[in-house]
Amino acid sequence: KSEGDYKPVLQALADMGYTFVEAASYKDGLLYGTPPQQFRRDVEATGMKVLSTHCTLNLSDKQLATGDFTEALKWWDECIAAHKAAGVEYIVVPSMRRIETLDGLATYCRYFNEVGARCKAAGIKFGYHNHSREFEKVEDRVMLDYMLENTDPDKVFFQMDVYWTVMGQASPVDYFTKYPGRFTMLHIKDHREIG
């Protein structure tokens, strides 16, 4: 979208009574094509606040194979600075590339721990949002369980999408019980509405 297209949507959300928004369009230092400080002002002009955002940078084949994600962390440093300027409290990774091995998943857990440490240093919380495929197995381990057990709770939280958890044949309540305190945020949607 071009700069400013989101303003009527923001006003409509505020008119419905929403007080926070979660953005999902970070690219090249901009949110919805707008400098982060301006996006923050536009949101706050409606009486709302930018609480969180979805953004990610997947690891390349080389980074995944070598475990060296130094270049990716440079991108994250810029991303974190932009989100701090936008007043964001939570940065959430909405998905990751398909992983076929536990070694690859372990690399992603180390990557997320490092990004989480950088977010924490900036006063931002860092998390991961599931879909149904995180309930698939990689080498006989459920991906989400492995991620929960191999990320640092002090650096990485999880934003459970309840719909996708159920679609993955799992119970949200079972996960809340098994991993207390790991699910800081939820996404709730109605299956009847989205099919």
Mark where each language-model region is:
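Mature catalytic domains of secreted/periplasmic carbohydrate-active enzymes
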Residues: 21-22, 33, 40-42, 47-48, ...
